[in-house]
Amino acid sequence: MGMKKTLLIVEDNLILCDILKRWLQKANYGVLTAIDEPSARRKIKENDVALVLTDVRLPEGDGISLLEWSISQGLHIPFVVMTEYATIADAVHAVKLGAKDYLPKPVHEVQLMDLLRGLLGLPFFVPSKKSFMKRRSLAIRETDRIACRVA
């Protein structure tokens, strides 16, 4: 089996960062974290990062300029940009600049793992029965909500 791939999460929301970190560690990725662009640049320089998962808006710098810096350094690290609905235009801009994809917030575990599998060539994420049932019940609740509005 190959070496564990190391991913960098660049996210200033510490709760979301911790959730993402736990999901990735559970999927057997190595995980580094940074809360702003300067610390993300340092981590990229000092480590063999296989992929960067970054928020667009950061307290110091932003995910777009981090991507631009990475490209200017001749690095070929795939970037995935996370964004809230209000910043979808930023995500589209990032993809045009070279980001591999973007994820809308809130980020969902299965969606993230399937995206990473596609980008890094790893096996599909197989959700547990519990997470499947949770997703199913959320989908059913959403369907019920829409049906009530229509009725």
What function would you assign to each model-found segment?
Residues 11:
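Conserved acidic carboxylate
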Residues 36, 62-65:
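Acidic catalytic/metal-coordinating carboxylates
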Residues 87-89, 107-116:
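C-terminal output helix
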Residues 129-151:
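AAA+ ATPase active-site-proximal loops
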